Regions:
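Solvent-exposed, glycine/polar-rich loop segments of beta-barrel outer-membrane systems
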Residues: 274, 330-332, 371-379, 410-431, ...
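Feature marks extracellular polysaccharide-active and adherence modules
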Residues: 5-10, 24, 29-31, 39-44, ...
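Outer membrane beta-barrel transmembrane domains
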Residues: 387, 447, 476-580
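Extracellular beta-strand/loop-rich repeat segments of large surface/secreted proteins
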Residues: 118, 124-218
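Outer membrane beta-barrel translocator domains of Type V secretion systems
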Residues: 269-453, 559-566, 571
Length: 580
């Protein structure tokens, strides 16, 4: 059988010359066939009379299929006859998701430092087991020969069960991510040999799905007469989803051969930031609906008015915009996306006054990043809605307007959340109905030089209904409805120029609401509510744009609006007017 190396380096010196070698960041992936010894990284330094230094750092082995003998994530050997010597195996990882093993004399070693006459250090090495590999041999975290230091070497069993191995030795951390289908009486890891499991001074962590209802779960069991041993320095912690911890929930049973978790431990909700991060999605989605409403009342109604004036019946209109806005919520959420409003408008005249009305369709799609202290979430938001509008324009320039819209929003979320010594990935997707309305009043006045000034005051209401979601980690959350009340006033000038018209504008907006929250519902009936993100506060904007005739019967306009305050960033809008 052949040896397999991700990285392999050997140095031998004579005449008192020092020997130094490092192998870092190498990896090997095996999906089939038969292999002898497998090394993610191998470093060897030998000197007859000088110093010797060998290090294997950050190397990896991925075992996905095949047959193996002995596997090393990283191995360092140092030897000298007269000088000092150091061998370090650090930060190496063996990932096991498949394969079979020649059991007689086989072992899987995360990090091995061999230096019989000097210093040997094996630290921060990891064996991680996923999937359904065949029966495993001896599992060894950090092995040393010489004046050895073995510290913070970890065994991780992730979302799998029914794994068997000979033993688990020289680990200082044990991490169990329980699968959602782990039932009472099933073990995640079973050990066969007579070698006991030493948890003295070790950190043991269990990550349970938030949806788990089994009263008692088996993390580890051993057939060894020596059993599982602990001491006062053993630290056991149980995490439930991303939402909290269970106190005094992990223990070794009366036989001394099973490491168990029971769910009746005292629950402590520690997911304040995590839950608030989940709720940021709802706040961001409501703000995104508000961006769409602004697009319709600014560019959409202007286009509808112009189109209706040139047609005898219903005339189509459209407005499109894009924005990159940061919404301060106590933390913040950054939204990027596009909004579209299309519809038909019709004009009815009473003397010189005009009454405009018609149906509309609105659509938006965007992405977001939310930040709550160290928690960074991201995802997408989409909405689709229909509605109608009415607007009255008088000869003195006064106008009165209103609209009603309703539809559905879809949101998704994903984040890698720090829990204990590791990171837990969680995600969800959900949807919610929404309804929106606005009322506005203003006046358009045209000066003798052709400059048009529009002053307006508009009130916007948006309600995004509450929603529920079960996270990929099993936690069940309810999200409260978001009620947004925004008042916006501003002025816009359209000034004729050679080849077109310059658009300048400014506005002030105040959000009176926009609060939301996330509530965790724990199996058993208890619930815990997150801090509330809020969109409440002042924002201001400055706008500049250009309007020009593209052809004889078509005029286009584009505008850029910069925002500051509670809502910060830039929005871009564009519209087209056809004369029929």
């Amino acid at each position: 059988m052949q040896r397999a190396y991700g990285g392999n380096a050997k140095v031998e010196t004579s005449g008192g010359t020092d020997a130094s070698v490092q192998v870092t960041g190498s990896s090997v992936t095996i999906t089939g066939g038969r292999s002898g010894n497998v090394f993610g990284g191998y470093a060897s330094a030998r000197s007859d009379a000088g110093n010797a230094y060998a290090a294997a750092r950050g190397n990896a082995v991925h075992l996905q299929g095949g047959v193996y003998q002995t596997v090393y994530g990283g191995m360092a050997e140092a030897q000298t006859n007269a000088g000092s010597s150091t061998a370090i195996a650090e930060g190496n990882t063996v990932y096991i998701s498949g394969g079979n093993y020649n059991m007689h004399g086989s072992s899987i070693v995360a990090g091995f430092a061999r230096n019989p006459a000097g210093i040997a250090i094996a630290r921060n090495n990891t064996i991680e087991i996923t999937g359904a590999p065949g029966p495993l041999p001896y599992l060894i975290g950090g092995n040393t020969i010489g004046s050895g230091i073995s510290e913070n070497n970890a065994l991780i069993v992730r979302r799998t069960k029914g794994i068997t191995a000979d033993s688990a030795e020289h680990f200082q951390r044990f991490v169990f991510y329980a699968p959602a289908d782990l039932a009472a009486g099933e073990a995640m890891l079973s050990l066969r040999s007579t070698v006991g499991v030493k948890l003295e001074g070790a950190a043991v962590e269990a990550y349970l799905p938030g949806s788990s209802t089994a009263h008692e779960l088996t993390l580890l069991q051993t057939a060894s007469p020596a059993g599982i041993t602990t001491d006062a320095a053993t630290k056991m912690t149980v995490y439930e989803g991303i939402s909290g911890t269970l106190a005094n929930a992990m223990y070794v049973d009366s036989t001394g051969k099973k490491l168990l978790v029971r769910r009746d431990g005292a629950f402590q909700f520690t997911g304040g930031d995590n839950a608030k991060s989940l709720a940021e999605t709802m706040a961001g989605a409501a703000a995104f609906l508000g961006t769409g409403a602004h697009l319709f009342t600014d560019g959409g109604l202007a286009s509808a008015s112009a189109e209706a004036a040139s047609a005898s019946g219903f005339a189509p209109f459209a407005a499109m915009g894009g924005a990159s806005l940061r919404h301060e919520t106590g933390s913040h959420v950054e939204m990027k996306g596009m909004n579209l409003a299309v519809g038909f408008s019709r004009e009815l005249k009473r003397g010189n006054d005009r009454l405009l009305f018609g149906p509309l369709v609105e659509y938006g799609r965007g992405s977001y990043d939310s930040y709550v202290n160290a928690v960074h979430g991201d995802g997408t938001v989409r909405y689709l809605g229909v509605g109608g509008f009415v607007r009255r324009e008088q000869t003195n320039g006064m106008f009165y307007e209103g609209s009603l819209r309703f539809g559905r929003s879809d949101m998704d979320y994903a984040a890698d959340i720090r829990m204990g010594s590791g990171t837990v990935h969680t995600s969800y997707d959900t949807d919610a109905n929404y309804i929106g309305a606005h009322l506005g009043i203003g006046q358009q006045v045209t000066a003798k030089n052709g400059t048009e000034r529009e002053m307006y005051l508009r009130y916007f209401y948006t309600r995004q209904d509450g929603a529920s979601a079960t996270l990929s980690t099993g936690d069940r959350y309810d999200f409260s409805a978001v009620d947004s009340h925004r008042l916006r006033t501003g002025v816009r000038w359209t000034m004729p120029q050679t080849g077109g018209a310059l658009i300048l504008g400014t506005s002030v907006q105040y959000e009176f609401g926009g609060d939301t929250s996330a509530t965790y519902h724990r199996p058993g009936g208890l619930s815990y509510t997150s801090p509330s993100p809020s969109l409440k506060g002042f924002s201001g904007s400055l706008e500049v744009g250009w309007k020009a005739a593209v052809r004889e019967n078509m005029t286009a306009n584009v505008a850029v609006e910069g925002w500051m305050g509670k809502q910060r960033g830039v929005s871009l809008s564009a519209g087209v007017e056809w004369m029929f």
